[in-house]
Amino acid sequence: MTGNEQKFSLQGKVAIVTGAGSGIGRETALCLANAGANVVVAEANETTGKETAAKVSAQTGSRGLFILTDVSRSESVQAMVIATIEAFGRLDIAVNNAALHPDASPIAELHEDHWQKIIGVNLVGVAFCLKWELQQMIQQGGGGSIINISSATINRPQEKMSAYIAAKHGITGLTQTAAVENGRHGIRVNALAPGGVATDLTMATMQELGLTEENEAARSSLFKRFAKPEEIAQSVLWLASDAASYVTGATIAVDSGLSLI
């Protein structure tokens, strides 16, 4: 193994990926596993979560473990972290990816229950995950990398996405605060802000908003296409690895230049 390969290796490490039942989460779980990490698939959908864990175990040299998790409930996240330690003994990497799609209504007509549900998963859920992940990393002596998944909409807001965008802005604040508080423990906390990604969630959102992939890709990408989920996963791998050892508190755009358009 060369020096560069060693920096990207996650051999012997343990990772949690929330919302890993599909899309970015699933590809991230597979990517981290291919780099050598054992991966906990923390997912609210038992069927898709078990599918991802099975793929990790079957397609990589690592172990995948599904744990049913509702990130909007602190006790569920705590139980998931405890189960991770019982299974693998430690926690080195956490990717807080679980999210609900936008509410598809303007602010003046927002559906209050759905708005609160989105905030509960997309923002409060990240806070709960950070709480229990950080406690475990500190308890085991420090070190580790946490990656929160934000969105390019923090720089390029769109109509009818108020709860989603508000939550993603909140992730920036959580990321920066967690980085400041935990640098002394050697824990790095960063966020990725993807642009358009070809996932089931993206397709469902566009359908609700009356948008098409062709038009949105042409409008929102210098490459005139959406990202593949695995392209986002590769950026997660970099932040998770020692190759990004001096990076913390950052929200990094992975958006094919959307923020420049």
Curated annotation (Swiss-Prot):
Pfam families on file: adh_short_C2
Key words of the record: NADP, Oxidoreductase
Cited function: Short chain dehydrogenase/reductase; part of the gene cluster that mediates the biosynthesis of astellolides, drimane-type sesquiterpene esters that show antimicrobial, anti-inflammatory, and anti-tumor activities. The first step in astellolide biosynthesis is performed by the sesquiterpene cyclase astC that catalyzes the formation of drimanyl pyrophosphate from farnesyl pyrophosphate. Drimanyl pyrophosphate is then dephosphorylated by the sesquiterpene phosphatase astI to produce drimanyl monophosphate which is further dephosphorylated to drim-8-ene-11-ol by atsK.
Binding site for NADP(+): 24, 70, 97, 131, 164, 168, 197, 199
GO terms of biological process kind: terpenoid biosynthetic process
Top EC group: oxidoreductase
Keyword tRNA processing applies: no
Record pathway: Secondary metabolite biosynthesis; terpenoid biosynthesis
Alphabetical list of Gene3D superfamilies matching this protein: NAD(P)-binding Rossmann-like Domain
Domain of life: Eukaryota
Active site, UniProt feature: 150, 164, 168
Family: Belongs to the short-chain dehydrogenases/reductases (SDR) family.
EC number(s) recorded for this UniProt protein: 1.1.-.-
Consequences of knocking out this gene: Significantly reduces the production of deacetyl astellolides A and B.
GO molecular function, one term: oxidoreductase activity
Protein name as annotated: Short chain dehydrogenase/reductase astE
Induction: Expression is regulated by the secondary metabolite regulator cclA.
